[in-house]
UniProtKB/Swiss-Prot annotation:
Record remark: domains: The N-terminal region contains the highly conserved SGGXDS motif, predicted to be a P-loop motif involved in ATP binding.
NCBIfam families tied to this protein: lysidine_TilS_N (TIGR02432)
Subcellular location: Cytoplasm
One Pfam family named in its UniProt record: ATP_bind_3
Residues that hold ATP according to the record: 37-42
Any one GO CC term of the record: cytoplasm
Protein name: tRNA(Ile)-lysidine synthase
GO MF annotations, alphabetized: ATP binding; tRNA(Ile)-lysidine synthase activity
Amino acid sequence: MRDKISESTRNIFDTVWKRIFPFHEMILSRPAVLSYSGGKDSSLLLHFYFWLWAEKKIPVPCIYHLDHSIRFNLEQEKKILDYTESTFPFPNLFKKKNIPALSQKLGKTLEETGRAFRYKDLEKISNQYEGYIVTGHHSTDYLETVFLNLIRGGGWNSLRTLGWYEKNRFRPLFAFTEDEIKTISQSESWPIFEDESNQSNEYLRNRIRNYILPLLLQEGADPDRIYKNFHRMEKPTSKILLKEVSSHKTPSFLKIDVWVLNDLSERERKFFIDRYLRSLNLHPTTRNFFQDLMDCLKKMNSFGIENKEAWFWKSSSYDLYVIPKNSLCLKKFKLESKNMILKWNGSQKKISPGFIPGLCSPGAKIRKNGMSIEISEILRQKEIPVPVRKMLPILYREGKVDVICLSLWDPRLGDIVADRSRNFI
């Protein structure tokens, strides 16, 4: 699918893409969480990212929209959802919150309450997707915010507000000039869903927009130039980027919270799972395999399913494990006999002389609390995935199981030590 945009808009988009070169590394490597209100600015943002995706410049973004319960217009909210779902092949994360009631409870303005709730939600989602937040602020919004902050007693930092990239929030519309935004607005007929509250002079921001800014613009104020006087476009440092390539270590497995999956639509689930696979340097799931995986999850039973690259395993009541088939946890342990160092799953531990490492044999038991307990039952209770159980190191002494090395699988788990060998280390 390609966005139906004019040649002039396409040229502007291409020019803006070149302008934001310092952010290319971040944009190319991480998915965007687009904050979409339905207004003209967020509409421009959405279509710009649609163009970037169609040009294969970015990974699939997702669309976030919050219904503030201020519009009192259920039909318009439905139209927003229908529009995004029918036009953009991206996951939709639509939330509804009674902001007026919450505002009254917190003793804050509607704008402050809505912004706080929205950003808290956006931060949570961006962390889940290992992505970054994108908002539709531009230079005129910057001037509005400066005056808003100054009226409320702000100081020097009021002039430095709304940076290009801060707190994992990216604002690419600052790369568009006001003339370019006007040209696009005149060239395109994208649906606009304005919030009724934007027209009300009950709110300070709207009074600034309707009375103060027109006077400044009439006197020759240039929002683009003013913004650039106080902001520099700089490449995000390695601390800001989620992961440094030089220090990145692919984990041996990942766990996906099933409660998070249950709250997502099927399209969002695929996006979410594919993000986890990407973190493991694996390819996205095929449509058929993903459907098989969803069918297994719906049954609420334990299951194990595999494709060419990974195992997907879940017990009846716990999270979904994703284990690459080349994972260290699926390879046999190694023993440095000289120093008696046991290595497995990227971890290691020193063992005492007299212990012989091995694997769990069928029906093997360990003496614990005066009882002989099957090791397979212990591993099941500890939620060790079935493919891993076969490779988990066991320490034997005199032909009997003495230690189940759970700490090599997960450092948070203690080793299971047989009754007669508590002092082995």
